């Protein structure tokens, strides 16, 4: 990635992200102390304010800040694990709650059965939760969650 | 399998340590406990500790790092828990947690971590800065940068910019910093205690080659440092050529000064003032060296330099 490929969001674009999150998860995310940026493939990143003040234009940048998620059609966003953790604390909608067995399957990359759903809309992206932890995102289909966590983050659990 | 110590290694460390050498050899041939750091950007100690103890893990606080713990389980167990998946802790060798403590990053600062991969110290710095300011986390090995990016993401750090650049050329971008972490590539002899394979690669020729290269890198890094700025020099090497000799070079040739370091609850020694007939600047004694048998950690060398 060249630094020139990083597009810092205006206030208006930031508001749009806040609205998308609010619409999908009924969560009011406080983004007042951070800045947002977008890179190729509609990837959205959260950065500390100071990053925006630094001239990184000449650097060969691999990543900036925290990957929040990827913007999708119809004003939706597929959140990363960290994105789910940030949004999850305030979320009131589109939350799929798992039991222990299914949670273990989920973090290994498998699709899972949902124990309890909180206002989950069919075929929507949902936050996957086990006890107090948000494990990542998936797609809610027929009371199941299709696992959408990136392969690089999956784990093989010990016995 | 037992660690085979090379005769030249033994000769060298008998010269440095005298009677204490036997203690070093004993620890090198044993296994030291694994350690990790709780990620307070994501979870509090109060929340995570009971969860880890429920697994039957026996934790022992690392006395020099508030959120560092020793644990006596194999690494493969540490990387296969839901808490690891969620980024609630970071596996890091206990001595490797010291250089960021010396750098003392503060919220809002702009810091350069010149050899950042795989990200242990980068994430520690990001955490100490409470996710504010900027850490430019640079490296030059793409494979290692991939691990760095994954670790920074798993850690939940928002204040890191990961860059790909040969450290010799970083100054050409014109950016200047008040604080630089210079945790340079080295022969790794301090890591023999955790990675016996390094003993096989250990040779005086390799040490001399590394030392020469480190001086080139150091001279370039100093160009990125503001006047009065701090550069923390660290290696996981125990070799005087890669440590005191390079600090002597920084003082006499690059014009930097060495500041005194104090780390509470850690056993360490002063930098050497002489080795194999070579005399170093007196201020080199302000650097610290840690041997594996001092605290049951990897060997480390750390020095705080001011421009």
At which residue positions do the language-model features occur?
Chain B
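S-adenosylmethionine
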Residues: 1-307
């Amino acid at each position: 990635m060249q630094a020139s490929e990083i597009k810092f969001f205006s206030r208006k674009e930031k508001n749009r992200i806040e609205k998308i999150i609010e619409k999908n998860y009924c969560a009011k995310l406080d983004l007042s102390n951070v800045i947002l940026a977008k890179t190729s493939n509609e990837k959205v990143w959260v950065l500390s304010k100071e990053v925006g003040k630094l001239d990184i234009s000449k650097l060969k940048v691999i990543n900036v800040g925290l990957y929040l998620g990827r913007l999708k059609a119809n004003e939706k966003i597929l959140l990363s694990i960290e994105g789910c953790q940030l949004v999850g604390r305030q979320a009131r909608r589109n939350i799929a709650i798992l039991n222990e067995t299914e949670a273990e399957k989920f973090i290994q990359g498998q699709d899972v059965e949902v124990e309890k759903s909180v206002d989950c809309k069919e075929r929507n992206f949902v936050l996957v939760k086990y006890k107090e932890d948000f494990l990542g995102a998936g797609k809610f289909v027929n009371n199941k969650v299709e696992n959408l966590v990136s392969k690089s983050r999956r784990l093989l659990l010990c016995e | 399998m037992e660690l085979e110590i090379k005769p030249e290694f033994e000769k060298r460390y008998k010269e440095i340590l005298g009677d204490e050498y036997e203690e070093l050899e004993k620890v090198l041939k044993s296994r030291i406990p694994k350690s990790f750091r709780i990620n307070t950007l994501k979870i509090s100690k109060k929340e995570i500790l009971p969860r880890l103890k429920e697994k039957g893990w026996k934790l022992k606080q690392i006395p020099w790092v508030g959120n560092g713990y020793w644990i006596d389980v194999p690494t493969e167990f540490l990387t296969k828990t839901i808490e690891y998946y969620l980024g609630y802790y970071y596996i890091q060798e206990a001595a490797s947690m010291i250089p960021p403590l010396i750098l003392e990053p503060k919220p809002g600062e702009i810091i350069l971590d010149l050899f950042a991969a795989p990200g242990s110290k980068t994430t520690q710095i990001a955490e100490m800065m409470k996710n504010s300011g900027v850490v430019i986390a640079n490296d030059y090995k793409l494979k290692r940068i991939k691990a760095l990016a994954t670790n920074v993401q798993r850690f939940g750090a928002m204040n890191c910019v990961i860059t790909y650049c040969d450290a010799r050329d970083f100054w050409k971008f014109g950016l200047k910093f008040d604080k630089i972490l210079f945790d340079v590539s080295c022969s790794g002899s301090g890591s023999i205690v955790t990675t016996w394979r390094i003993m096989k690669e250990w040779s005086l020729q390799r040490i001399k080659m590394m030392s020469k290269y480190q001086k080139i890198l150091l001279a370039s890094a100093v160009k990125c440092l503001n006047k009065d700025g701090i550069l923390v020099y660290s290696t996981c090497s125990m070799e005087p050529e890669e440590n005191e000799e390079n600090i002597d070079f920084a003082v006499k040739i690059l014009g930097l000064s060495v500041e005194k370091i104090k780390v509470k609850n850690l056993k360490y020694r002063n930098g050497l003032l002489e080795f194999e007939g070579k005399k170093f600047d007196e201020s080199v004694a302000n650097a610290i060296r840690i041997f594996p048998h001092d605290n049951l950690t990897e060997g480390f060398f750390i020095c705080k330099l001011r421009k």
